[in-house]
Swiss-Prot record:
Its EC number is 3.1.26.11. CDD domains: RNaseZ_ZiPD-like_MBL-fold. It comes from the Bacteria. The active site is at residue 65. GO terms for molecular function: 3'-tRNA processing endoribonuclease activity; zinc ion binding. Binds 2 Zn(2+) ions. It comes from Clostridium perfringens (strain ATCC 13124 / DSM 756 / JCM 1290 / NCIMB 6125 / NCTC 8237 / Type A). Belongs to the RNase Z family. Zn(2+) 1 binds at residues 61, 63, 152, 220. Keywords: Endonuclease, Hydrolase, Metal-binding, Nuclease, tRNA processing, Zinc. Its cofactor is Zn(2+). This is Ribonuclease Z.
Length: 316
């Protein structure tokens, strides 16, 4: 099960009814934060998400409405008692920006691992943290994060998250591979085991991969030809809808953003299950007034609001 909360759905500047861009995902009690606009700490408190269990922070790009909440949040996480490493993923330039922020944070009780312009990352999800691992055919990770270069006025990344579903134990396979019974349980937990000088791997006792959960996130971009394939068959697609009306197309093109209908066309082409729109222009008072513009292209389109939640489950 993956729990998703829209912490902020505004673009440009915070509004009385909308915080700036941020999304938090919770899987097995560990959290991933997508963007960190001004006020993210406040809306996290409002939604009761907690701070200490954030393991990965993914930044789409370096415009202020997506990163100005980061210095304060990093400080608060430090005050929460966290000592485990945190991964920050972002576009080219993210390292320099974080190093600048750290001037105001001379002491943090945890290490920041900054992954700049990374494209394919694999993580194991443990009880106490998420941990970056090397891609290995013998060991299946719990989470993969892929990025895509978008078309904005500064380097910008889209993100796709694939939560893998644990494979079932296969007795026939375990016996065929002559795996001792005493290591079966550890291999089912995806651990590498050595016994009497022989190494055993989880693939020796587990069946075929099962369909997992896919969430994709693209914000602050024009539509590109690569996006539909990148978001293909996502269970949830969170996408910017800066402008509700096609009458604002000239603004969307000039500022390198999207209209509701453009986002919906991408959702349709990508065959996603649900489109959740976010990052609304301050000029839009009620984004729901424009939802039909999206539904003309993709019926299962919804306007996101601060605090809105989705629960994505593995299919039986």
């Amino acid at each position: 099960m993956l729990n998703v909360i829209l912490l902020g759905t505004g673009g440009g500047m915070p509004m009385p009814n909308r915080f700036l861009s941020s999304v938090v995902m919770n899987f097995k009690g560990r959290k991933i934060l997508l963007d960190c606009g001004e006020g993210t700490q406040v809306t996290m408190r409002v939604n009761g998400t907690g701070f200490k269990s954030i393991d990965i922070i993914c930044i789409s790009h370096l415009h202020g409405d997506h990163i100005y909440g980061l210095p304060g949040l990093l400080s608060t996480i430090g005050n929460s008692g966290r000592v485990e490493d945190i991964y920050i993923i972002g576009p080219k330039g993210i390292k320099e920006v974080i190093e600048g922020f750290l001037i105001t944070l001379p002491y943090l009780p945890y290490k920041l691992n900054i992954l700049e312009d990374a494209s394919n990352l694999e993580f194991m999800v443990k009880k106490e943290k998420m941990e970056l691992v090397e891609e290995d055919e013998k060991i299946s990770s719990d989470l993969s994060i892929k990025t895509l270069e978008l078309d904005h006025s500064s380097p910008c990344l889209g993100y796709s998250f694939n939560i893998r579903r644990g494979r079932k134990f296969n007795l026939e396979k375990a016996l065929m591979n002559k795996v001792p019974k005493e290591v079966w349980s550890k291999l089912q937990r995806n651990e590498e085991v050595s016994l009497n000088g022989v190494k055993y791997y989880s693939y020796m006792v587990l069946g075929d991969e099962r369909k997992g959960i896919k969430l994709s996130y693209t914000t602050d971009t024009r539509p590109t030809e690569d996006i539909p394939g990148f978001i293909k068959e996502s269970d949830l697609y969170i996408c910017e809808g800066t402008y509700g009306s096609e009458e604002d197309m000239h603004k969307a093109i000039k500022n390198k953003h999207m209209t509701f209908k453009e986002a919906a066309n991408l959702a349709k082409r990508g065959q996603v299950k649900e489109l959740l729109l976010t990052h609304f222009s301050p000029a839009i008072n009620d984004p729901k007034e424009f939802i039909n513009n999206a539904r003309e292209a993709f019926e299962n389109s919804h306007v996101g609001s601060d605090g809105e939640e989705r629960v994505l489950n593995f299919k039986k």
